Amino acid sequence: PNSFLRNAVIGDDVTIDSSKIVESSVGNRSTVGPMSHLRNNTEICEDCRIGNFVEFKNSHFGDGSKCAHLTYIGDSDFGKKINVGCGVVTVNYDGKHKFRTTVHDGAFIGSNCNLIAPVTIGENALLAAGSTITDSVDDGDMGIARARQSIKKGFGTTYKNK
C-alpha cells in the first residue's frame, strides 16, 4: 500500500510497504519498506530485507543481505548475506567525482559506519560501529576507525574555492 513503482521488476512473494521503486528490481521473497527508496539501476536480490528510511542508488545487494534502517547505499556492489547496521552511508561523491564501494559476502557493517569510496570490504570482514573507513579491509579482518575530533580552521572555505 501507498507505494510508487515505475519501470520496476518485482519478484514473487515480495512485500513492499509505503516505498518508492524506480527503474530497479526486487528479488523473490524480499521485503522493502516502509519509507524506502530504490533509485535507478538498483538490484535487490532474493531473500533481502530493506527496512525503513533506506535509500539505494545504482547498486547491487546480494541474496540474503539485510539493511534494516536509516541508511544510504549509492554506487555500490554488496555480496550475499551481508548485514548493514543502522545509519550506514556509502560516501560515493567527493564534490566532483563519484566512486564505487564493494562489500563481499558475509561482511558485517556496524551501525553508523561511513565507507569512503573507493573502498573494498572483504569476505566475512567486520566494520566496527562508528567507523569511518577510508582504506580497504581484507577478508576476515576487522576495520575500526574512530578518531578524536579536530577542527581545521578555514578548510571548508578553502575546499569550496578550489
Regions found by a protein language model. Name each.
Residues N7-V9, I16-K162:
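Glycine-rich hexapeptide-repeat left-handed beta-helix
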